Structure formats: structure tokens, C-alpha cells
């Protein structure tokens, strides 16, 4: 095994915290910190709830439009087919959301159990 020589340090090394003194952040560090703190830090759960809320608002709008159309007697077969298609689409979307929410709750339960 070869010998390893370590050169003597010519600098004075600070070894205590008192010698270091208080740390002052730079202006760039302060700006980055302020920017990070001002961002939306609600997390994934908040964004999922916001999306579900937006979908709920969309459903309410579509359902109210459908109720308005149903209140008026429609004799046109095309309009009846469009209303039926809207109803089918709403039903399918609600079922998919219910299944997704059920699966997400199962995943959360699995994570909380630890595997």
C-alpha cells in the first residue's frame, strides 16, 4: 500500500459556532424564499378536491340545461336524441367518478395500513 502524504494546511480553520457568527442570507436567497412561500402549497389533495368541485359545477350546469329542455315539450326526434345522449353521458361520467373515488379511498386505506 503506497504512503499517502497529507500537506499541512496554511489556513486557519474555524472550529466553533461562535466564531462563525450569524448567517446572513443573500438577496437572491431571500427572493427565492419569498417566491416559494407565495406559491400555492396546498398539495395534491387540494388540487384533486378542486377538480372534483369543478366537475360538480359542470354537472350541475348540464343537469339544469337538461331539466330546462325537458320542461319544454319537444317533438323533434333530433332534440330528443340529444337529450338522451346528454343523460347517458352524465350517467357514465358520474359512474366513472364514483369508481375513481372508491379506488382512491382504497389506495389511501392501503397506504394508511402500511402495505
Curated annotation (Swiss-Prot):
NCBIfam families: yscI_hrpB_dom
Protein name: Yop proteins translocation protein I
Gene behind the chain: yscI
Induction remarks: At 37 degrees Celsius in the absence of calcium.
Species in which this protein is naturally found: Yersinia pseudotuberculosis serotype I (strain IP32953)
Stretches that traverse the bilayer: none
Database matches in Pfam families: T3SS_basalb_I
Protein family according to the UniProt entry: Belongs to the YscI/HrpB family.
Function: Belongs to an operon involved in the translocation of Yop proteins across the bacterial membranes or in the specific control of this function.
GO biological process: protein secretion by the type III secretion system
